Amino acid sequence: MAQAIADELGVKLEVSSMSFDNVLTSLQTGKADLAIAGISATEERKEVFDFSIPYYENKISFLIRKSDLEKYKDLDSLASANIAAQKGTVPESMVKEQLPKAQLTSLTNMGEAVNELQSGKVDAVHMDEPVALSYAGKNSDLAVATVSLTMKEGEANAVAIKKGNSDLKEVVDKVIQKLKDDGTYQTYLEKASKLTEVEQ
């Protein structure tokens, strides 16, 4: 998607890889023009950044050990569990808000969180559902729990843009709409689901 936006703008794409919790800071300080990292357009973030039209309606799930499927069937069973989530993300804030008695382990890398789950250091990892399904599909000892927390409405993933840059937002919106309309974005999703295991 970033390449398609760069092509539309007629500029060379420069991608900076960083931990999720540094992404929005880099945008805010002017080190980046756009942030595309599975960022939910929350009301809190909208006060600081502009956002494109949504490109993905996110679903968030708990990845657990398959042997614990019967153990974690409702929110009460997760109330005092040790839950890992990626630092600075909506899944992390959902655990803080909806499971305040749970022991939260905030990590910068999803692969690390899954390793902690498999080694028994945490009981569950709260993450984007497509990523959770991919991990479960490739690791016979893992499964996606049937219980989930409540997503707030309107918190779809969108491209974050520095506040007030309406010209850039207009171009980004146009590109996203085109990618969704012509089926290219669906192809991106399919490729992404195959790549989620690379970091593990």
Which residues make up each language-model segment?
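Flexible hinge/capping segments at coil-to-helix
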Residues: 52, 66-83
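Short helix-loop capping/hinge motifs at secondary-structure junctions, enriched
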Residues: 66-74, 105, 164-170
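A ligand-binding cleft/hinge motif common to bilobed small-molecule-binding domains
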Residues: 39-48, 94-97, 118, 123-153
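Periplasmic-binding protein-like
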Residues: 57-64, 129, 133-177, 193-200
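Extracytoplasmic small-molecule ligand-binding "clamshell" domains
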Residues: 1-38
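Ligand-binding clefts/hinges and TM-proximal coupling segments of bilobed small-molecule sensing domains
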Residues: 90-105, 143-148, 176-200
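Hydrophobic residues within well-ordered alpha-helices
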Residues: 5, 27-28, 78, 117-118, ...
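Short helix-initiation/N-cap motifs at beta->coil->alpha
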Residues: 14-25, 70, 90, 105-115, ...
